[in-house]
């Protein structure tokens, strides 16, 4: 697990500039040195595992996912399963003041080798395919930021007002052969403009439909605007929930766009192009400048 300070990438002045959420690292709120408390917490969790559990974690390659679950599940304010399955438990950047070492150590020590949660593995089966030139986005640019087993990220470059995805967690296997049930949860974004529909009874497949939307306050940090939709996927083996897997979509709110909802309920672009007012920052690696200097 890597730990990095956010250093001006997650602040009230410019908002949340991180393009995607992942369970592979922790981002600390603050600048250099803000990572130290989180590193200590991770070390304490590792030290608290029972020897037989730690051996089983090594054998299954599940040390990091289990540590991630414990760190997130035992933070200040995450006292229930409902709280864990919410955006507040999975922020972009973590505050040191939310670390609860005693709870983290206690949870780590309570996990037996037969109760280890699985690693959620995702795959996109279908998704809206924008047509370059027709849907107006940059030449040679893809809307796919990355696809990894536990994190999928997209950039909403096209002018389409609604996009959908069918995602599966069917490759997820419990290390001890337990039956699994899945929860798909909107962690951030406008709940009136995101719809998640499990396709199967156990939740291994889900259809996600998203409408264009404006920035929203970040969960747990309302003074920081977020330009991202995050959906968390959790597997429960009857004892513990897994660490989250994420589907993230970054919206380019530095662009001036206007959408209107048609009679069929689908948003359609009225105006696109140009810079939004307020000087919203855009990462030049994700949004290269056009020859006229605009993005």
Walk through the language-model features, giving the residues of each:
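Extended, non-transmembrane interaction/recognition domains
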Residues: 1-145, 149
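Structural beta-strand segments of beta-rich domains
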Residues: 118, 163-167
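Low-complexity "stalk/linker" and mucin-like segments enriched in Ser/Thr/Pro/Ala/Gly
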Residues: 122, 133-134, 142-157, 177, ...
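Acidic, Ser/Thr
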Residues: 168-176
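Short beta-strand elements bearing conserved aromatic residues within extracellular beta-rich modules
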Residues: 182-184
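Exposed beta-strand face motif in extracellular beta-rich ectodomains
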Residues: 225-231
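Conserved structural position at the C-terminal beta-strand
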Residues: 235-237
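Extended alpha-helical scaffolding regions
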Residues: 240-295
């Amino acid at each position: 697990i890597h730990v990095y300070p956010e250093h001006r990438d997650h602040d009230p002045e410019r908002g949340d500039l991180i393009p995607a959420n992942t369970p592979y690292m922790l981002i600390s709120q603050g600048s250099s040195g803000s990572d130290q408390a989180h590193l200590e917490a991770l070390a304490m969790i590792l030290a608290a595992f029972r020897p037989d559990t730690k051996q089983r974690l090594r054998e299954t390659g599940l040390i990091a996912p289990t540590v991630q679950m414990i760190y997130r599940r035992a933070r200040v304010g995450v006292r229930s399963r409902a709280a864990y399955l919410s955006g507040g438990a999975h922020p972009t950047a973590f505050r040191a003041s939310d670390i609860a070492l005693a709870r983290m150590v206690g949870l780590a020590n309570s996990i037996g080798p037969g109760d280890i949660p699985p690693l959620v593995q995702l795959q996109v089966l279908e998704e809206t395919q924008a047509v370059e030139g027709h849907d107006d986005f940059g030449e040679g640019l893809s809307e796919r930021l990355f696809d990894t087993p536990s994190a999928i990220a997209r950039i909403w470059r096209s002018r389409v007002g609604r996009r959908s995805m069918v995602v599966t967690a069917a490759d997820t296997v419990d290390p001890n052969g337990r039956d699994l049930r899945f929860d798909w949860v909107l962690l951030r974004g406008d709940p009136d403009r995101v719809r998640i529909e499990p396709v199967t009874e156990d939740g291994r497949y889900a259809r996600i439909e998203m409408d264009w939307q404006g920035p929203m306050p970040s969960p747990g940090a309302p003074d920081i605007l977020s330009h991202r939709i995050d959906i968390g996927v959790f597997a429960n083996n009857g004892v513990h929930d897994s660490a989250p897997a994420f589907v993230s979509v970054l919206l380019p709110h530095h662009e001036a766009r206007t959408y209107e909802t048609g009679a069929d309920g689908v948003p359609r672009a009225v105006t696109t192009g140009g810079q939004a007012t307020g000087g919203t920052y855009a990462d030049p690696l994700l949004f290269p400048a056009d020859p006229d200097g605009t993005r």
